[in-house]
Amino acid sequence: MIKNIITTIDDYARTQPNNVVYDVQGVTHTYAELKAYSDALAAHLDTLDLPAKDPIIVFGGQTFEMIATFLGVVKSGRAYIPIDTHSPNERLTMINEIAKPAAVIAVADLPTGVGTTPVITPDQLAAIFATPVDYQADHVVSGDDNYYIIFTSGTTGMPKGVQISHDNLVSYVDWMLSDDFGLPDQPNSLSQPPYSFDLSVMDVYPTLALGGTLYALPKAVTDDFKQLFAALPTLPINVWVSTPSFMDICLLEPKFNAENLPTLTHFLFCGEELTHKTAATLKKRFPDARIFNTYGPTETCVAVTQIEITDAALAQYDRLPIGYAKADTRILVVDENGEAVPNGTEGELIIAGPSVSKGYLNNSEKTAKAFFELDGQPAYHSGDIGTMDADGLFRYRGRVDFQIKMHGYRIELEEVDHFLAQQQHIKQAVAVPKYDKEHKVTQMIAYVVPKPNDFESDFALTTAIKKDLQGMMMEYMIPQRFVYQTSLPLTPNGKIDVKSIIKEVNPE
């Protein structure tokens, strides 16, 4: 059982100072460096006249300096808010407005201003890291204090900041280190998801808590299949963490198999549905490896259920279950009145336990709608539809609302609609998902009533709309296809009939 995340990680700087903690394309950093960098930053933050316990935005990509900054912020007694370099400027601006952070630490150059918020620039940060200090980490984040805050999609175009406390994270990491997963000692783990995506917590903190090494794959590599396929066999990893969608890309490379990556023993998936096809293909490529399907919203700290996908499981299930609840967590399946439903009946998944967030940062209205207390434990309305069988095995069946998962990213269709409505060439629009036969979202399609325009073709109009949207929203939220209509169907009460459009896109 972990008492404190920071103390656990810092201990490795004493017991194995020269062990590599971070490797990005052959450039390595040690546990001693991690402690020295994070101590130096914490010492510097302590000298600044910053509001106590207010969070700090950390802007950057997949680098060692990002990890060191996270730990330095936490050592100073504050939560960090990770924002990836590939975020649109507007997202950085909105998060800064919502979070009201004590400061912004720019590990990479900021692409836009952040008003009056104090900023530590990349050059200043480098100088801080280079300053030796003798730091006493005596006021690190602990207990119910926020450890990190990750912003997810919001229905009005305003993202929601999910507050994850130190104890939330400990509950999660303790589970990851348990026999449920059987992770190797000092794991060599793939670190591929961006740090602003809570799936990254699945590789970062269990690995650091076990004194292992993170092997980072930057976005520049993962976006270029040639570079990616060349890099994969060079990684001496034994633990793989990614979305199923990223695995689907890697499986396009025939040489991605146990023969060329003989050290790989564990595959962990989260963020979206793991299809039977993906799991079966992976099992053929890596017959002796252990494959785990996990499930959980960001609001419950990464994941709360797991199941090992064995040959027997593949033979038994056409649509893979999401698994069993972790030992300290209770999951109920309820109807629209909040009453528990019989085993095997579909209902909303209610998640209660010590890894459930206290709510959304500076958003009491949304917090009150989604979070409550259940028998003395914090609980969360997941909005996910599922079933539970008599043995406590859970299956995922979809969303209560119009929220989808695509390529591991959670997207609220209403937020996409919000941005579409702001686009200058659009009169009316709605975004809907396209599912494949494995019930996985493969595409987001925008049904659009355009304003009168002079574009020579639909293609030219689409190009102009997409270009505008790139400055307003995350790339993964932009619809892949645009279908132009003279009008959209309406419900009897005058709202756009989204369900009928979804049926049109997904004929049975």
Swiss-Prot record:
ATP binds at T152, S153, N293, T294, Y295, G296, P297, T298, D384, Y396, R397, G398, R399, K495. The keyword ATP-binding applies. D-alanine binds at D198, V302, K495. Its main location: cytoplasm. The gene is dltA. It comes from Lactiplantibacillus plantarum (strain ATCC BAA-793 / NCIMB 8826 / WCFS1). GO terms for biological process: lipoteichoic acid biosynthetic process. GO terms for molecular function: ATP binding; D-alanine [D-alanyl carrier protein] ligase activity. Its EC number is 6.2.1.54. GO terms for cellular component: cytoplasm. This is D-alanine--D-alanyl carrier protein ligase. It is found in: Cytoplasm. Belongs to the ATP-dependent AMP-binding enzyme family. DltA subfamily. Pathway: Cell wall biogenesis; lipoteichoic acid biosynthesis.
